[in-house]
Amino acid sequence: MFRKLLGVLAAGIVAGTALAPAAQAADNPYGDPNLVSMFNGTDLSAWTSSKTGLWSAKNGVIHGNGTARGWLYYNKAQVGTFRWIFNVRQVKGNHKPTVLIWGTTDPIRDALSAIQFQPPNGGHWDYRPGHNDGGGKLFTQLPHTTIDIKKWAQCELIGDAATGVARMACCPLTGTAATCKGVEVLRFTDKTAGRTGPLALQVHNSGIQDEYRGLYVESPVVTKPGEFLTL
């Protein structure tokens, strides 16, 4: 067990690494040449899972297999100040989709001791030691029309490690549209929370099958720092 944990840590700790835009980054639908694709559509080589068999690359998406609670984090870099854009939908499940920011892989604890955002409608949780609660006034949920989690939605998270402010904007994708006009749904503020850590997809409990596609990250943030691209 100890050797297995060391292997996970060795594979995943790439702290503070600046991301270089990939050749195909200019092909993203957001007009930002500094966005880097996080998923090649065929395998999970850029990702590290908490458990074997929890996730799979299926039909061009990252598919949660619903086998257990756990996470899948991007292992090419860890980020503090960032822009993260993705599409999400839930195929099956009894809990909203969840993603994690500002966690840590050293040591590895439940949910990476991270701040949880629940796309696309803005639920939340604080997994940091001494917290493990809903976060109270640290989170602000903003009024918006409820987005159907069973259909594809676009979400953008922007985080500033220096200020401890992270925000999420989402919108429903219609038909074959590649993008949509987002609306801010959730804001988190705690100056003590911002840190360099992994960006992760989370399965809250067994039986949940969430899917993700079109994942892009920008760090450091060069294009419109502190502003959403998708609004």
Question: What role is predicted for each listed range?
Answer:
Residues 1-9:
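Bacterial N-terminal signal peptides that target proteins for export
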Residues 8-18:
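Bacterial N-terminal signal peptides
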Residues 25-231:
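Carbohydrate-interacting regions of secretory-pathway proteins
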Residues 19-25:
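Sec/Tat signal peptide C-region and signal peptidase I cleavage site
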